[in-house]
Amino acid sequence: EICACLVGSEMCIRDSSKYSYLLARACQYRRFKEFEDKHLPLTEKIYGNQKQLVSLEQEFDAFVCGSDQIWSPLLYDPVYYFNFLSKGCNIRTVAYAPSIGIGNALLMRKEQIALMQNIDYISCREEQGAQIIGDITGREVPVVLDPTLMVRPADWEKLVNPVSQFENESYILCYFLGSNVHQSYVDRLRKELCCKIVNIQMFNRLNGTNADYQVSDIGPSEFLGLIRKAKWVCTDSFHAIIFSYIFQRRISVFERFKSTDTQSQNSRIYTLLNILDMEKVLVRNDSVCNMPERVEHLGSCTALEKWKDLSLEFIRKALK
């Protein structure tokens, strides 16, 4: 399809790497769509704007938003604060595990703060965010688990699609969203483990990890498959940490932002590692050979169960 589109528009791509990248992205889009169609029970009608959402007010007793960084002031969208509901309507509103991403309350927008005040039940995904929202709204804001951690590992296993190319390969999986790909650390780890590097190529095409294999066409199931089979994972990604924990992979976690960055999103990583009892896997200095302990089981299942109970209690209270 993408080839036909390019030819039909008489577009000439001189850089073959860009053409290959477009093909990979088209394949990735198809895999995401297939995953959505197969696993997500969505309404037939798509509600794509505030005007369309207004029509839902008479159909539901409660509205729930969450999670991820839907409350980041850098990605502000009033829909995630239920601005489409009429004032005074008798509908319960719940925010489950939204993340504001940043640690600087001064970055919060005035209209964002005003809309927060109207939400009946609010929780947050990270401790620093919960404190900021609590100070803004004047109420206690509990920290709850990301929804991915509320699902049993056995259920995630069912969604795994192994990437056949690497089924018989021993590899370190790299997945970095930030511009720092921590090459010196990855190279030392490669030497120590005597295995190859597989890099998931997302936003780092110009500054990517020097890997044996570059992967840019995977969908959600293949993403799970790559983590599930990895000998070690190197990442600065929140959800790559979660799935490494779920599949019990050894992992090195890196900070995506400098501590002096006013737009730093590191606080959610710190909270997650604390909840999972995995603080020791955080690498703060690439120049030091700071390899995590070789333990067979990373994290505390007991601690996670406690957090699951607290998170479910919030949901029950909000929707009772």
Identify the meaning behind each predicted range.
Residues K196-A240:
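Donor-binding and catalytic core of enzymes assembling or modifying cell-surface/extracellular glycoconjugates
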